[in-house]
């Protein structure tokens, strides 16, 4: 975190301030206190790993986050926590590239733009209605 702050010409934070911010954010995402004592992703379930990614984004506040099939393997409760976390991070200074095969994620994180990739190329771009159409008719027409 301090590397990012320093690179942006901002004041670094001390270890106690960082630890407090980390605990508060972890608590908001439903993590137990013992999670912060583990190494990154050590002994985490699939859902915990996805929630931990949201924790990292909440702390680091990147300008661009790439979420590759972040809904994969999540139960409905974990999906809700992850999508609420992402929605809370949305701002004019942050962008998300969300890669998914399923409408259920896009029902909870409304995309500004949808791009369909087939055979390594973007074959269609537009609004959320593209994803809704794919949910109904599949990917067949995209090759």
Language-model-derived ranges and their functions:
Residues 1-62:
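ABC-family P-loop ATPase nucleotide-binding domains
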Residues 117, 121-143:
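Conserved beta-strand-loop-alpha-helix hinge in the C-terminal portion
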Residues 79-92:
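Helical segment within the ABC ATPase nucleotide-binding domain
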Residues 75-80, 125:
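Conserved D-loop-proximal element of ABC-family nucleotide-binding domains
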Residues 97, 114-115:
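Conserved catalytic/dimer-interface elements of ABC ATPase nucleotide-binding domains
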Residues 66-70, 77:
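Walker B catalytic motif
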């Amino acid at each position: 975190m301090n590397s990012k702050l320093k690179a942006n010409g901002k004041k670094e934070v001390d270890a106690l301030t960082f630890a407090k911010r980390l605990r508060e954010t972890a608590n908001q995402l439903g993590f137990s206190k013992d999670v912060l004592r583990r190494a990154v992703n050590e002994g985490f379930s699939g859902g915990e790993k996805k929630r931990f990614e949201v924790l990292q984004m909440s702390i680091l506040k990147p300008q661009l986050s790439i979420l590759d099939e972040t809904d994969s393997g999540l139960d409905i409760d974990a999906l809700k926590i992850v999508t609420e976390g992402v929605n809370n991070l949305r701002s004019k200074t942050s962008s998300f590239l969300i890669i998914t095969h399923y409408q259920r994620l896009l029902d909870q994180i409304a995309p500004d733009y949808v791009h369909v990739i087939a055979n390594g190329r973007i074959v269609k771009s537009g609004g959320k209605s593209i994803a809704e159409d794919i949910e109904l008719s599949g990917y067949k027409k995209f090759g």
